[in-house]
């Protein structure tokens, strides 16, 4: 049930490095800990911190393609805004993403047709030497509200050092104006996923908008099925290479509102069991089922999937 995606990096026609989606399953468990009153710092490959309706992941999924280190500090939520930061230095594997430290909002899976708004605010800054990295929202969908992605929607609001999105041709397929910004839209594929990437013309270090407008553009203009189910929505940075880098989110928020229909697997069925059976799913981003186990303990494999074992 648990699989590991293998990154495949190609060059853009313009010569920039290309970001690939981080894997949605890994073989090693994640250590998740609730945030205490003080800031919490973690440095393990799959470490994460929960606070105020968000889970922030260190997520060093591509670390073996280079050499370096990364740590994550979560300050917590104040006045409705999450603050966190990551420090990293990576060398080698210049065309490979090393990690995706990111914050994922806790929300049940929902059909795209049922989502009425995804309001978000993100204020951030980046410093470092010879950085190649992006700053991006990352949304995953599939047809059955499970945890195997079929579509990935990225919204890039920052890029450094020639980082570029997955693309079949290296050229944008459209230039939609969304929220007063003209974005370059790229389309590509990775493993079983179709990847859409909206890339801003420059760094937007204080972004405020509604991500549902990107979703609607894809369903209305690019053939993405509105029946797809959004099960994970995060925001973070993908580093390739650089040294002494610090990415700081000084204020972040996201919420997902639905019209009350079209979410999950539909109504009329039995209520989910109070606890999952042995080897059953017991958690993960967007998971709305049982979170305890009738046998064994609930162990996180990654930010999308936890299993009773």
Curated annotation (Swiss-Prot):
Glycans are attached at residue 206. It is found in: Secreted. Residues 274-309 form the CBM1 domain. Residues 1-19 form the signal peptide. GO terms for cellular component: extracellular region. GO terms for molecular function: cellulase activity; cellulose binding. Its EC number is 3.2.1.4. Keywords: Carbohydrate metabolism, Cellulose degradation, Glycoprotein, Glycosidase, Hydrolase, Polysaccharide degradation, Secreted, Signal. It catalyses: Endohydrolysis of (1->4)-beta-D-glucosidic linkages in cellulose, lichenin and cereal beta-D-glucans. Its main location: secreted. GO terms for biological process: cellulose catabolic process. Gene3D superfamilies: 2.60.120.180. Endoglucanase that hydrolyzes 1,3-1,4-beta-glucan. The biological conversion of cellulose to glucose generally requires three types of hydrolytic enzymes: (1) Endoglucanases which cut internal beta-1,4-glucosidic bonds; (2) Exocellobiohydrolases that cut the disaccharide cellobiose from the non-reducing end of the cellulose polymer chain; (3) Beta-1,4-glucosidases which hydrolyze the cellobiose and other short cello-oligosaccharides to glucose. Belongs to the glycosyl hydrolase 12 (cellulase H) family. This is Endoglucanase cel12C. It comes from Pyricularia oryzae (strain 70-15 / ATCC MYA-4617 / FGSC 8958) (Rice blast fungus). The lineage of its organism: Eukaryota, Fungi, Dikarya, Ascomycota, Pezizomycotina.
